[in-house]
Amino acid sequence: VTTKKWVQNPVYSAGSEKKDTDLLLIIDTSGSMGAITDPKSNLHQAVLAAYGIIKYFENRKNQIALLGFSDRITANVDWTKDYDSIREKLLLNGGGGTSFPIARIQSIIESSTNPLVTVIITDGEIQNTNQTIDYFKEYLTNGNKLFIFLQDRKSTIEHYKTLTNYGAKVLKTLTANEMRDSVLNEVI
């Protein structure tokens, strides 16, 4: 009778785990997104989707940053594990125009040391498209994930075709479930 001596596989040793992935939520809060209290509005659906995505990252104890925008920055929360603060900052009504804050987005992304999942939910065309696409190409080549959800039936994903070639997911979606499931199916 012999007994097999088990050797611990170094791949499963403590300290060699994959780095945590953090979440950057970017939500359009312009007037065209509607009122958060109207279940049929794009903003209501965006916030519901965000809550579902936040829950996943909260369960994993990962950091989250939030940026709400219209013609100005309406919510700005740097990397945190204070998930209730993020949820609270999401509860605002839409107002104003749509101006995509790429400089602030770059600043938030560059302040993270972990791989990232960035989720952008909007019903309009992203302004300064060329600058945005160039930045997110580099972002994607660094192993990060990008989801852009267009909530307007008239929006076109053609502007973002280049980003899909780099691995971004660009989808026309109208419901919270579609947005949440699209993200979670990729990150789980």
Predicted features by range, described:
Residues V1-T21, R180:
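Acidic/polar low-complexity segments with low predicted structural confidence
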Residues S16, G31, Y83-D84, I109-E110, ...:
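Basic/hydrophobic alpha-helical interface regions
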Residues S16-I121, E125-Q131, F149-E158:
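Von Willebrand factor
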Residues I54-N62, T141-Y160:
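A short, conserved beta-to-alpha structural element at the edge of catalytic cores
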Residues P101-A103, T156-I188:
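C-terminal helix of von Willebrand factor
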Residues Q131-E138, H159-T162:
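A short acidic, amphipathic alpha-helical/loop segment
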